Curated annotation (Swiss-Prot):
ATP binds at residues 9-17, 115. One of its GO terms (cellular component) is cytoplasm. Belongs to the argininosuccinate synthase family. Type 1 subfamily. Keywords: Amino-acid biosynthesis, Arginine biosynthesis, ATP-binding, Cytoplasm, Ligase, Nucleotide-binding. It is an enzyme of class 6 (ligase). It is found in: Cytoplasm. This is Argininosuccinate synthase. The lineage of its organism: Bacteria, Bacillati, Bacillota, Bacilli, Lactobacillales. The gene is argG. One of its GO terms (biological process) is L-arginine biosynthetic process.
Length: 397
C-alpha cells in the first residue's frame, strides 16, 4: 500500500532523528532542514536523515530571505518581547513553516511534522502558521505524542539504529539563527542561579572582553543596514559580521524570565550581539530623522507587533497592517551611526544623516542661536491654558 508523504521539519538532533524512525512506519518521510544561520554541519544533517530512513532530504539556504523578510521588519520596529527579548526564535518559525508548506505542495505531501514539545511556544507558532498558509494540511507532533523521558527516547533510538548525538549530555537546549542564540534548561531553570559561562556560545564574557573599545560605523538606507565601516554587505552577511565583532566584546547577553504563550513563565538566556548593535544604531538614526509624533507613536505599534510575532501570528492581517505602518516610516531613516563596543555595551556615540531634523542653529546656546525665545511667552500661555483653567475651576469648588 502506498504511504502518504510527510514533510518533517528536521534539525538533525535527537528528537527529529527519532521522529524519522517513528514516522517512517506510516509515512514516506521527506526531511527538510533550513539554514537560518545557525552554523550547523548541513551536509552531515542531510545525509543523516537519509541514513535513518527519510526517502528524501533537503537542506535549504534561507539566510538572506530570513534577514530581508523577517529580521528586517523586526529591526525597523525595534521589536522586543516584554522590552527585553529581540524575538530570536519567534522570527524564524514563520519562514520555516512557509518553506515546509511549499515543500508539501511541491512533493504532494499531505502532512507536516515538527519536533516541538507540548509545553513550548513553537508548537503554536508552527501549527498556526501552517494553518494560515494551507488549512488542508495535517500536522503531527511526535514528541508531543510520545511524552517520553529522555532515557526512553535514547533506548528507542538505539533499538532503531538512530545515532545518538555526542553532545547529548549538554544540559542546555539551544536554538540559534542569524538574529541570536537562545539557551534554556539545566541550571538555568532555577532563576536564582547565575547563568554559568558554559551557557554562552557566541559572546565573550564582558569581564574577559578586550580592554580597548572598538568603534563600528553602521550605514542605513531607508532603514536598511547596508554597510559596516564603509564595506557594503548583504543583510545576512552584515548581521553575521556584527555577531562576530560585537560578540567579541560581550555585547547582547540577555537574562529574561518571560511569559510564554502557553501560560507558564520560562527563564531564558539569549545572546544577540549583532541584533542589539543594530537595534541600538537604528534607533539613533530614527531619533535624528523622524518627526516627534511618529517617534512617540511608533513604540506603541512596535510593542503590539512584538506580541503578535511572539504569539505565532506572523501570517495575520493585524501583523500585515502594523508592518505596513512601520515600513512607511523608514523612507527618511538614512545615515550612519558610530557604535562604541566595550565590555558588554553597545553605545552610539555619534550619528549623522542627510535627512537629519536636528538644526544646530536652533539647538545651540551660543550667539549663533536662531531660536525665537520671545515666542516662548505666548506659547507657554496657550499650552498651559487648559491646566490653568482646570486649576481655577477646582479652586472655586
Amino acid at each position: 500500500m502506498t504511504k502518504e508523504k510527510l514533510i518533517l521539519a528536521y534539525s538533525g538532533g535527537l528528537d527529529t532523528s527519532v521522529a524519522i524512525a517513528w514516522l517512517k512506519k506510516d509515512y514516506d518521510v521527506i526531511a527538510v532542514c533550513m539554514d537560518v544561520g545557525e552554523g550547523k554541519n548541513l551536509e552531515f544533517i542531510h545525509d543523516k536523515a537519509l541514513s535513518i530512513g527519510a526517502i528524501e532530504s533537503h537542506v535549504l539556504d534561507v539566510k538572506e530571505e530570513f534577514a530581508q523578510e523577517y529580521v528586517l521588519p523586526a529591526l525597523q520596529a525595534h521589536a522586543y518581547y516584554e522590552q527585553k527579548y529581540p524575538l530570536v526564535s519567534a522570527l524564524s518559525r514563520p519562514l520555516i513553516s512557509k518553506k515546509l508548506v511549499e515543500m508539501a505542495h511541491k512533493t504532494g505531501a499531505t502532512t507536516i511534522a515538527h519536533g516541538c514539545t507540548g509545553k513550548g511556544n513553537d508548537q503554536v507558532r508552527f501549527e498556526v502558521a501552517i494553518a494560515a498558509l494551507d488549512p488542508s494540511l495535517k500536522v503531527v507532533a511526535p514528541v508531543r505524542e510520545w511524552k517520553w523521558a529522555r532515557e526512553e527516547e535514547i533506548i528507542f533510538a538505539k533499538e532503531n539504529g538512530v545515532p545518538v548525538p555526542a553532545d547529548l549530555d549538554s544540559p542546555y537546549s539551544v536554538d540559534q539563527n542569524l538574529w541570536g542564540r537562545a539557551n534554556e534548561c539545566g541550571v538555568l531553570e532555577n532563576p536564582w542561579n547565575e547563568a554559568p559561562e558554559d551557557t554562552f556560545g557566541i559572546t565573550t564574557s564582558p569581564e574577559n572582553a578586550p580592554d580597548t573599545p572598538e568603534y563600528v560605523d553602521i550605514e542605513f538606507k531607508a532603514g536598511i543596514p547596508v554597510a559596516v565601516n564603509g564595506e557594503k554587505l548583504s543583510l545576512a552577511n552584515l548581521i553575521q559580521r556584527l555577531n562576530v565583532i560585537a560578540g567579541k566584546h560581550g555585547v547582547g547577553r540577555i537574562d529574561h524570565v518571560e511569559n510564554r504563550l502557553v501560560g507558564i513563565k520560562s527563564r531564558e538566556i539569549y545572546e544577540c550581539p549583532g541584533a542589539i548593535t543594530l537595534l541600538t544604531a537604528h534607533k539613533e538614526i530614527e531619533d535624528l530623522t523622524l518627526v516627534r509624533e511618529v517617534s512617540h507613536f511608533k513604540p506603541i505599534v512596535s510593542n503590539e507587533l512584538s506580541n503578535l510575532i511572539y504569539n505565532g501570528l506572523w501570517f495575520n492581517p493585524a501583523t500585515d497592517a502594523l508592518k505596513a505602518y512601520l515600513a512607511q516610516t523608514q523612507a527618511v531613516v538614512n545615515g550612519t551611526a558610530k557604535v562604541k563596543l566595550y565590555k558588554g555595551s553597545a553605545k552610539v556615540v555619534a550619528r549623522k544623516s542627510p535627512n537629519s531634523l536636528y538644526d544646530e542653529d536652533l539647538a545651540t546656546y551660543t550667539s549663533a542661536d536662531t531660536f525665537d525665545q520671545d515666542a516662548a511667552v505666548g506659547f507657554i500661555k496657550l499650552w498651559g491654558l487648559p491646566t490653568k483653567v482646570n486649576a481655577e475651576i477646582h479652586k472655586k469648588s
